[in-house]
């Protein structure tokens, strides 16, 4: 059983905005320290950014307007906490406590992820999809239901009828769709709106990639300040995650679909 949402789901819009601001921070300095929370809906986008490098309201507003349209932007930017900054002063260390797992992706999860991408390539609007064995549920906004019935004749499509979706119908918040992003690898920490020093980003990516490579479950934990995880220097894990983020096109692109 698996649920997948597309990049125009309000929660993913929030993730994408958060990712865009992290990308902006990395354009300004090589290793920023940043954590961004986004709440979006009904014409307003609220953003709080704790950051070592100033982004400015103009940069944040430009990202919101590009991704979500001409919304009113409420932007709060504060410096990173001094104790957290000191943790990274002498080298790359885990930026927070956390538990993590990587689980090999199942065929069912791969199948639904592809269905979601196929539909989104034709209808780039808010959508949510579920696959539970033979039961396929497709909720796709702004679509021609008959088109989907022709391709997926056995699916349950828009059970309550046609709908519009988007941030004028539903609110979105950062890191609220981790099940969609990570499948069975979801634990407590969110992937989006954070720099690579955050274990929620780098260790989650590392554990997921290791599980796909070994085809075995991976479980890890860390304490803030740790300089090794899984017997490897944390700096090495950060570079693995950095290369992965680069391979998908940056933090904003990563936020579109997550790891699955």
What residue ranges belong to the model's regions?
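A domain-level signal for the structural core that forms small-molecule/cofactor-binding pockets
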Residues: 1-260
């Amino acid at each position: 059983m698996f649920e997948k949402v597309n990049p125009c789901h309000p929660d993913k819009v929030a993730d994408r905005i958060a990712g865009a601001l992290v990308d902006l921070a990395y354009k300004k300095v090589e290793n920023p320290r940043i954590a961004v929370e986004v709440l979006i809906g009904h014409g307003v986008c609220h953003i709080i950014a704790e950051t070592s490098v100033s982004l400015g309201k103009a940069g944040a507003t430009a990202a919101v307007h590009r991704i979500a349209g001409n919304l009113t932007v409420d932007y709060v930017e504060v410096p990173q906490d001094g104790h957290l900054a000191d943790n990274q002063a002498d080298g790359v260390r885990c930026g927070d406590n956390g538990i993590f797992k990587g689980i090999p992706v199942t065929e069912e999860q791969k199948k639904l992820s592809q269905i979601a991408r196929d539909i989104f390539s034709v209808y780039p609007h808010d959508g949510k999809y579920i696959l539970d064995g033979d039961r396929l549920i497709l909720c796709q906004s702004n679509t021609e239901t008959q088109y989907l019935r022709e391709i997926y004749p056995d699916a349950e499509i828009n059970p309550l009828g046609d709908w519009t979706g988007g941030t004028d119908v539903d609110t979105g918040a950062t890191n609220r769709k981790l099940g969609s992003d990570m499948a069975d690898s979801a634990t407590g920490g969110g992937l989006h709106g954070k720099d690579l020093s955050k274990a929620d980003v780098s260790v989650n990516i590392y554990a997921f990639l290791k599980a796909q490579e070994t085809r075995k479950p991976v479980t890890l934990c860390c304490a803030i300040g740790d300089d090794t995880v899984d017997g490897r220097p944390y700096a090495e894990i950060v570079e693995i995650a950095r290369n992965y983020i680069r391979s998908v096109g940056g933090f904003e692109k990563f936020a579109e679909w997550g790891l699955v």
